[in-house]
UniProtKB/Swiss-Prot annotation:
<feature type="binding site">
    <location>
        <position position="72"/>
    </location>
    <ligand>
        <name>substrate</name>
    </ligand>
</feature>
<dbReference type="InterPro" id="IPR000257">
    <property type="entry name" value="Uroporphyrinogen_deCOase"/>
</dbReference>
<dbReference type="GO" id="GO:0004853">
    <property type="term" value="F:uroporphyrinogen decarboxylase activity"/>
</dbReference>
<feature type="binding site">
    <location>
        <position position="201"/>
    </location>
    <ligand>
        <name>substrate</name>
    </ligand>
</feature>
<protein>
    <recommendedName>
        <fullName>Uroporphyrinogen decarboxylase</fullName>
        <ecNumber>4.1.1.37</ecNumber>
    </recommendedName>
</protein>
<comment type="function">
    <text>Catalyzes the decarboxylation of four acetate groups of uroporphyrinogen-III to yield coproporphyrinogen-III.</text>
</comment>
<dbReference type="InterPro" id="IPR038071">
    <property type="entry name" value="UROD/MetE-like_sf"/>
</dbReference>
<dbReference type="InterPro" id="IPR006361">
    <property type="entry name" value="Uroporphyrinogen_deCO2ase_HemE"/>
</dbReference>
<comment type="subunit">
    <text>Homodimer.</text>
</comment>
<dbReference type="GO" id="GO:0006782">
    <property type="term" value="P:protoporphyrinogen IX biosynthetic process"/>
</dbReference>
<dbReference type="GO" id="GO:0005829">
    <property type="term" value="C:cytosol"/>
</dbReference>
<dbReference type="GO" id="GO:0006783">
    <property type="term" value="P:heme biosynthetic process"/>
</dbReference>
<feature type="binding site">
    <location>
        <position position="312"/>
    </location>
    <ligand>
        <name>substrate</name>
    </ligand>
</feature>
<keyword id="KW-0627">Porphyrin biosynthesis</keyword>
<dbReference type="Pfam" id="PF01208">
    <property type="entry name" value="URO-D"/>
</dbReference>
<comment type="similarity">
    <text>Belongs to the uroporphyrinogen decarboxylase family.</text>
</comment>
<keyword id="KW-0963">Cytoplasm</keyword>
Amino acid sequence: MKEAFLKACRGIRTDYTPVWFMRQAGRYMPEYQKLRQKYDFLTMCKTPEIAAEVTLQPVKVLGVDAAILFSDILIPLEAMGLKIEFIDDKGPQVLPNIRTVADLEILGELNLEKIGFVFDAIRILINELNVPLIGFAASPFTLATYVIEGGSTKEFVNTKRFMFLEPEGFHKLMSLFTKATQKYLNEQIRAGVHAVQIFDTWAGILSPFDYESFVKPYVKRLIESLKTVPVIYFSSNTAGLINHLKELNADVLSIDWRIDIKDATDLLKNKPLQGNLDPLTLLGSDEELFKRVEKVLIGARGAKSHIFNLGHGVNINTSVDKLKKLVDFVHEFKFMED
């Protein structure tokens, strides 16, 4: 198995910079689109053989240094008694919603048997991959936002109303999701994943004070329960939370493009970093793309180690050939001698 990604997770510099992409298994790939014509999204997630096939596609086509399991961050909710649905042009929908302390009774304990297909897919993949497999889950907070809002939103009014009107109830919800996510990710680890990534996609909607109060303690607790494999913590739009992020004890911090990676390197000394190219750079010219890729690579040179990635998922309009070129560029990039 290729080791560059796992070495970088542990803070070891390798001969080349390892690279993989969030949402690398997805809608921009013709192979994925063919399967999607036959099956709806949830069926693909819930059929281990299909989930494994989709996970393998970008490894074979792009030559990336790690695979990430094809699934969705909302999958565990069905195993807690909620209903999830994916509607074209609307995104994920979650019912019923939890918006008060009284609503917490809706939520059941995570039943791993109901999502056994996730672990079956992992067991298939570890026998077929020649690169490490990354498992993943939403952070307790990001999971909570979907359950409270019922889907995607811009203002998170219901989330913040619950948080500020009934803080004790919100803390209870966070505790429930922390326990469930610990259980879910540890089962992925038992099934064979080599690393896990926690997606805190919506952490950036909070002030530093509220992140410290309502999110940080639960993320720390979650990370500390997962230390048998490297843990990557991804958050979006969180440059203003950087001082809190460095205290999380994640093995790797994955950052988006809204912070210069050189600045992040200076602020997060002795911390492996992942990121942080703007995904939409891939829609531009090769010249503009590689100019920015080089800036990321050089900017991250001072980090303990670096895993090249995007600052968010691959956009649906991205060219497969452009991603291939990007992988080759990163692998072949030579730094000037220090």
